[in-house]
A protein has these predicted regions:
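Non-catalytic substrate-recognition and accessory regions of acyl/acetyltransferase enzymes
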Residues: 2-4, 12-215
């Protein structure tokens, strides 16, 4: 008789293999920094209408794209991280037109590069988070992704299995000092310093509200 449980076993094995592959390695991170040319560009004070205290800008390159990384610094040593490929002006003009017509459209966060490198990028970001913690040990972090396309409604924001995978890596690295909160509705998460959270119970709401304001 055919073993109907085989696909489930294979699925579990695949997940276990994937989780083993995403364990953070500083050696691997250093290798990726060199390979992708990770570089600090500059820090900026907030522009009009922005609520962060400081913006740190980084770049790195893949064979197809140049990526921009933004790390926004807020009160309570909260850092919100985002990244996106640098796209030409024609892309934005076209998407603006689609949005104005009520059609599905993309932004820099939801544009699909099809490079299949999100875990490599996350490794780079974890490495930078560790660097920040060396300087500010009570820091907390947030990150967010995006749906495959936008329709200008809250229903765009959907659960994603990728977030669970990402948070496995984050839990493995930060669980001793931080609580990792999965925000699958926003395709993102929070990494909250336990000591700060104990002293300021509203920290989670503060960080989540800032993350949501970007979506």
């Amino acid at each position: 008789m055919k073993d109907l449980r085989l696909p489930e076993k294979m699925s579990r094995a695949k997940i276990k293999q994937l989780l083993n592959e995403i364990k953070f390695s500083q050696e691997r991170s250093d290798e990726l920094r060199d390979k992708f040319g990770w570089r600090y560009v500059q820090s900026e004070r907030p522009k009009t209408g922005k609520s962060y205290n400081k913006l740190r800008i980084y770049t790195f390159h893949t064979p197809k794209y140049k990526y921009i990384v933004h790390i926004e610094e807020y009160d309570y040593d909260y850092f919100l991280i985002s990244f996106f490929p640098k796209l030409n002006i024609d892309f934005y003009v076209k998407q603006q037109k689609l949005a104005s017509m009520g059609k599905k459209y993309y932004d820099e966060y939801s544009y699909l590069t099809k490079e299949n490198i999100p875990l490599k990028i996350l490794t780079l970001l974890v490495s930078e988070m560790k660097n920040i913690l060396k300087d500010k040990p009570y820091s907390s972090f947030g990150y967010f992704g995006a749906p495959d396309y936008k329709m200008g409604e809250k229903t765009d924001l959907f659960n994603t299995k990728r977030v669970r995978i990402y948070n496995e890596l984050l839990n493995g690295e930060f669980s001793q000092t931080h609580e990792v909160k999965s925000l699958e509705t926003y395709s993102g998460g929070l990494i909250l310093n336990k000591a700060v959270l104990q002293e300021y119970p509203n920290l989670e709401l503060y960080c989540e509200d800032i993350l949501k304001s970007h979506l």
